[in-house]
From Swiss-Prot:
Induction: Expression is not induced in cellulose-inducible conditions (in Avicel- and wheat bran-containing complex medium). Cu(2+) binds at residues 20, 90, 172. This is AA9 family lytic polysaccharide monooxygenase A. It comes from Botryotinia fuckeliana (strain B05.10). Has a modular structure: an endo-beta-1,4-glucanase catalytic module at the N-terminus, a linker rich in serines and threonines, and a C-terminal carbohydrate-binding module (CBM). The genes for catalytic modules and CBMs seem to have evolved separately and have been linked by gene fusion.
Amino acid sequence: MKSFISLLGLSFLTCHASAHYIFQSFTYKNIQYPPYGYIRVNDNYNSPVIDLASNDLRCNSGGETSKGTQTITVKAGDSFSFTGDIQVYHQGPLSIYMAKAPTTAAAFDGSGQVWFKILDIGPTFTNQVATWNLYQTYTYTIPPNLPNGDYLLRIQQLAIHNPYPGGIPQFYIECAQITVTNGGSGTPGPLVSIPGAFSDTDPGYTANIYSNFFNYTVPGPAVWASQGGSSAYTGISNGNNAATTLASMPAATGAATTATTIVTTTAAGSGSATKTGTSATATATGAVVQKFGQCGGQGWTGGTTCVAGSTCTATNAYYSQCL
């Protein structure tokens, strides 16, 4: 009997863990970069943040500092994507926030009344039945009116599948580091502090999606209303962007070693095409790769030896990661 209970508990924990997810990959100009290349590394695997007073609400546990994450240069008006390790599983809204860094994105911890929201994705109601947009990849646009500078770009999915107060809503969060160019002269807002932007009395936090659930307000500030252009989000339920090239990270410092890479990209409804280009290696061959860094995959010429305590694990034919 004891063995049966232990196995039952293990099964529950395995299912519970598998229902979690993490937005680990960033895409720009149809190039999807390796996990944590431009996204700050968290130290809680795929677990959510649940403490409304915690600084972890900004960029996840362990994401308060850069830890070597690179910063990608993007143009205002261009699209970008966050991709999770699996499809978002729990019902709840998704939001994207930004915060302008006083100096560099890498040096910014996200403190202060600096955060503004550029996107909310709540449920749609048809005949009083809610439908949630649960995707693996979410794509949106850098606001055309956004001033130039360094920013933290924060994705947040709030899981409310286990209603409060019996359950605690779960925040799934990651931050990318970006430098915006070709920007405008808008004034983003309203500005809020994180933590501080969410309360356990917010209707969108306390909502019971299983009882009398006919409308919904996403927690947090209003979305910045003067972003410019006519941006609309898109989502892919399972998998990466169409027409996406999987790429290695450019070298962070010093002269980069380049290699010719041939990759196959698939566009929706257009079959496949072959693209040839050069990509810089993330680490020199033989260098020790830090935890969560890339350590292998098709075309990879960087380091293949993981730091002590980590193992090089294949995610797919194109990407292996130190875990």
